[in-house]
């Protein structure tokens, strides 16, 4: 997916090569200390929580669809969401304006990467939702990241986020 993970900048492909190499490195280090990849993952879940991610693609065809998508992004910028699944939104990153705004303090910091029509909302409980129009298809994509103590709670939070996002459409 276009919202992938890159370990460094030495390989231009997201996800495939670098994430596989990172996973193999974790497994090798775990084995060297008498542990396993699985045990290390459980430790990370205990320390950092469990995350569940989901992609929602909303198709809006034709000229009117493109206008609807543009209006959705405009509304998200001009009337920011205050809560997601009952959690307070505490930070909004706007990659079109290159500004990250802390909603608790009002502090703004510069985002130092190329501009893009992307908004990311972060809550006080570690949930995040990113919105961006597709550059190649007539759709807007919402990337959901839910943090919880266990898998069932994370899945429930993703389902609740989906319901919240349907209200925005």
Question: What is the predicted role of each segment?
Answer:
Residues 1-132, 139-143, 150-156, 162-169:
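Phosphate-binding and adjacent anionic-ligand microenvironments
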């Amino acid at each position: 997916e276009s919202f992938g993970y890159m370990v460094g900048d030495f390989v231009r492909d997201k996800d495939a090569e670098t994430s596989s190499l990172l996973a193999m490195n974790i497994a090798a280090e775990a084995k060297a200390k008498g542990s396993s990849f699985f045990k290390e993952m459980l430790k990370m879940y205990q320390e950092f929580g469990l995350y569940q991610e989901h992609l929602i693609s909303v198709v809006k065809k034709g000229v009117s669809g493109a206008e609807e998508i543009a209006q959705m992004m405009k509304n998200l910028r001009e009337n920011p969401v205050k809560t997601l699944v009952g959690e307070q939104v505490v930070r909004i990153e706007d990659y079109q304006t290159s500004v990250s705004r802390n909603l608790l303090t009002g502090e703004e910091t510069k985002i130092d990467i190329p501009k893009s029509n992307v908004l990311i909302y972060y809550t006080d409980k570690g949930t995040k939702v990113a919105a961006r129009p597709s550059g190649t298809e007539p759709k807007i994509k919402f990337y959901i990241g839910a943090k919880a103590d266990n898998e069932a709670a994370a899945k429930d939070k993703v389902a609740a986020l989906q319901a919240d996002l349907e209200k925005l459409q």
